[in-house]
Amino acid sequence: VVAGLFGGWIYLVPFFTGAAADRMGFRKALILAFALLTVGYGTLGMVTTLTPVLIGLGLIVLGGAFVKPVITGTVSKSSDSFNRARAFSIFYMVVNIGSFTGKTIVAPMRIQMGVETVPWFSAGSSLLALILVLLIYRPPEDGAEQPRNMRETLQGMWMAMSNLRFLGLILITAGFWAIQGQLYASMPDYVLRMAGETYKPEWYANVNPLVVVLFVVAITQMVRKWKPENSILVAMVMIPFSAVAMASSAFIEGPVNIFGLAVHPITLMMVIGISIQGLAECFLSPKYLEYASKQDPPGKEGVFLGFAHINTFFAWIFGFIFSGFLLKKYCPEPTTLPDAIAVQHTQWLAGQAPIPEAYAHAHYLWFAYIGVGLISLVLLIGYIWFTRRLDARRMG
């Protein structure tokens, strides 16, 4: 729940920081962002008590919330309607290169050097980014279009919130990100409790950015002439199947032989499910950002693209809280169970006992997210039907 709240705030605050970035200029905003991230991560590296840790996390949330609308706004300003989707696909590929390499470096660092080194690594990376921004970041700025006062800033925020078509798509795509967010909410606990501590869920999660890096530019090029909602529809069709794959390990008996290697069913089906998620992201994210960028008037790129991230705010708040309840019901923490059941769970993981009744239906967790995906798909189909009918009526 705590992780969901902090993760959610990173996607809510960009609406406000995006408005501030439009006012102050993207260069100043990005300098402030990486300064906040450097100080925030450095604070986490120096302290261990609750209040300073919360202050450090708050600085990280605020810094990250500036980065999102500024970078996507820069992509929007630096591209035209012909190449905007491709520009966003390159941006998204680079983001996932960072995600993949970050996870790859941090996991062994945490194990071999201690978890306390991770904030210092993040602070150093943020400081390097700050130096690069100071040296080379020169975004296209149009001072005449920037909000001149708080009234114009608030008008831009209201313009974004009152765009009901945009708001509808934001709320519908939140269902997609609620499922994708289970990489960090349900999946780690599910893997450790159903396969054992020797399995590393962080490596499973790394499959997602790897797939995106490999395929996002090619897929975006393939769908470049599609309407954004059609590409998003493909993603919405795919995302329930990722949850189907993750649930399917419950129906596979024993290890699966893959090219002579004995692979645990959970490992196999998690990798398949996460790969499906990655491919679905390739259809959704660049075209969604392209759609969002076409809603913003000149000088208001930050606030509109900041508003576009609110779908993930709703997704993480819902997804992490929902995950907490589902894990407690179907895949509980062993230490919360009676001693006899906890012992049986340990023996079951070692292949020396039958599965405890408390874990017999753990895969039902993924059934719930299949439902979330199907509901979102139906809503998107209704959204496309309604908006196209509305457009036809206006043109007729």
Predicted regions and their residues:
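Central cavity-lining transmembrane alpha-helices of secondary-active solute carriers
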Residues: A3-A19, N206-I219
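C-terminal ends and interior cores of transmembrane alpha-helices
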Residues: A35-T49, V237-A262
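Intracellular juxtamembrane helix-capping segments at the cytosolic ends
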Residues: F66-D80, C282-P297
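Glycine-rich segments within core transmembrane alpha-helices of 12-TM secondary carriers
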Residues: A85-R110, S125-S126, A308-S323
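Juxtamembrane intracellular "pre-TM" segments in multi-pass secondary transporters
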Residues: G143-I170
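Extracytoplasmic gate region of multi-pass secondary transporters
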Residues: L164-E202, F320
